[in-house]
């Protein structure tokens, strides 16, 4: 019997997930299908329920339904709990729904694939929205030395700090801080842009001096050409820039493993996806 999986979103026609999961499944002999489902903005729960009632086994969730998906779960992972959102749903044998958030796990996996261990790295996270929030616990669990969060609206960055410094009786309190963009100083080993500014060809208002010849810059956005943030980082002398395509493949791989118990080959699929992206009409 073929197991059904899907990604829910609105819009969803642009989704790379069906291609990615199809490539994951191909060499494993796993019998499954994976489709993109456009859910009405006010009809996500009904669409998801219909999918599960028709035999669906699991689903990915993207904008704008991640918070709604969180509310529908009977159980959630630690990453999902702290993110306040889920991107992966699993229908369990007892009929309950488990929610996971694999976004941050995908980011960390891609960083490690490119850089090796993240232990003792000083990380600057730009942005304080859902993308940033979902990545904080996985970054901290990767044993980084320090996480600085900076956002145009400083109160949002401080709110994230308050959430994560209260976790595990303050276990992370000394590792997470919020700093105004205009007051950023010192050196960072890794700078991560979690904002969508690059999609509009724009940049966060960052001081150039935070980038050194040792700094690696990571933009969660991606495209056929270099992103605006990464182009700026190179112009300021960054040692290396990475876009978010590997994070996309990485989070999908974590979902696939949760559902199938198999770890797919992400590098092969990333190469195929990069080639596919480059071949798309500009």
Curated annotation (Swiss-Prot):
Q: What is its EC number?
A: 1.1.1.25
Task: Give the first-level EC class, as a single word.
Answer: oxidoreductase
What residues make up the catalytic site? 66 (proton acceptor)
Q: Does the keyword Amino-acid biosynthesis apply?
A: yes
On the tree of life, the source organism's domain of life is Bacteria
> GO CC terms for this protein?
cytosol
Give the residues the record marks as binding NADP(+): 127-131, 151-156, 220, 244
Where along this sequence does the record place binding of shikimate?
15-17, 62, 87, 103, 222
- Where does this protein act, in terms of pathway? Metabolic intermediate biosynthesis; chorismate biosynthesis; chorismate from D-erythrose 4-phosphate and phosphoenolpyruvate: step 4/7
Pfam families membership? SDH_C, Shikimate_DH, Shikimate_dh_N
Q: InterPro entries from the xrefs?
A: Aminoacid_DH-like_N_sf, NAD(P)-bd_dom_sf, SDH_C, Shikimate_DH, Shikimate_DH-bd_N, Shikimate_DH_fam, Shikm_DH/Glu-tRNA_Rdtase
Q: Which residues form a coiled coil?
A: none
Q: Which UniProt keywords apply?
A: Amino-acid biosynthesis, Aromatic amino acid biosynthesis, NADP, Oxidoreductase
GO MF entry, a single one? NADP binding
Q: Which reaction does it catalyse?
A: shikimate + NADP(+) = 3-dehydroshikimate + NADPH + H(+)
Q: Which GO terms describe its biological process?
A: amino acid biosynthetic process; aromatic amino acid family biosynthetic process; chorismate biosynthetic process; shikimate metabolic process
Q: NCBIfam families recorded for this chain?
A: aroE, PRK00258.1-2
Q: Which family does it belong to?
A: Belongs to the shikimate dehydrogenase family.
- Protein's job: Involved in the biosynthesis of the chorismate, which leads to the biosynthesis of aromatic amino acids. Catalyzes the reversible NADPH linked reduction of 3-dehydroshikimate (DHSA) to yield shikimate (SA).
Q: Which HAMAP family match?
A: Shikimate_DH_AroE
Q: Summarize the subunit comment.
A: Homodimer.
Name this protein carries in UniProt: Shikimate dehydrogenase (NADP(+))
Organism equals Shewanella baltica (strain OS223)
Report the gene name.
Answer: aroE
